[in-house]
Amino acid sequence: MVEILYQRSGYPYLVPLCIACDFDGTITTVDTAELTLRKFAAGKWEKYDVLLAEGRISLEECMIEQFKLIKAPKEEIIRMLDSAIGLRPGISEFVEFCRNKNIEFTILSAGLDFYIDHIIAKYGWNSVTRVSGTTNMTDGITVEFPKHRFSDSKTFKEDFVKIQKEMKKDVWYFGDGTSDREGALAADMVFTVAGSRLSEIMDAKGKIHRDFQDFVEVLTVLKNSLA
């Protein structure tokens, strides 16, 4: 496991590094969950996004209600997404560097687990782990999200970050949207997709963060941190 060298009171100390990365709109260039909803949802799914933004429902509650509205087989969803989305430049090289350096890389996503697994297998990201909801294709898509270990966690993403920090790890969080807010606020270092809603939220909260366009520039930052 790679450790990051810090200075505190003039003395160096090492902290294990964990990469926590959102999927939709961060690894991918478009939000696959939103695209799936626009294509296949049988109902007014947008109202749940409004309720989430207003803080009236949780992230998990939002996705549970939205996924219920999706009326399409898994194979059709995968075919549609494969034809419509791209990956953010440099992500495969970033994942490979993390693998070679034994840096933990975890995808945190409120999106479709089966499509994330499809991408992981397609690109051979065998070292990547996924923390997300577990879907079941019934009448619509039902989803069960990880239980929170910490009672004050607002989302499973925040809970994951807290667990890593409890294990004395340094967490670098990558994201783009409202669903990443709590996880990013709990992280040690935050990378936000340039021009994204998460970037605006971090500015409003006074949380130091670094905007990025692609993972090529992020890889340079990581390499410099390990130099």
Identify the function of each model-found stretch.
Residues 2-64, 68:
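Active-site neighborhood of HAD-like aspartate-dependent phosphohydrolases
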Residues 57-93, 101-103:
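Metal-dependent phosphoesterase signature
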Residues 91-121, 129-134:
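Substrate-recognition element of Asp-dependent hydrolases with the DxDx(T/V) motif
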Residues 109-110, 169-206:
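Acidic, Mg2+-coordinating phosphoryl-transfer loop and its flanking beta/alpha structural elements
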Residues 120-135, 186-188, 200-202:
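Structural recognition of alpha->loop->beta junctions
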Residues 125-151:
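Histidine/lysine/aspartate-rich catalytic loop segments that bind and position anionic ligands
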Residues 131, 191-193, 208-217:
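Short acidic-hydrophobic, aromatic-tinged amphipathic segments that line or gate anion-handling sites
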Residues 152-179:
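Conserved Lys-Pro-Asp/Glu-containing loop-to-beta segment of HAD-superfamily phosphomonoesterases
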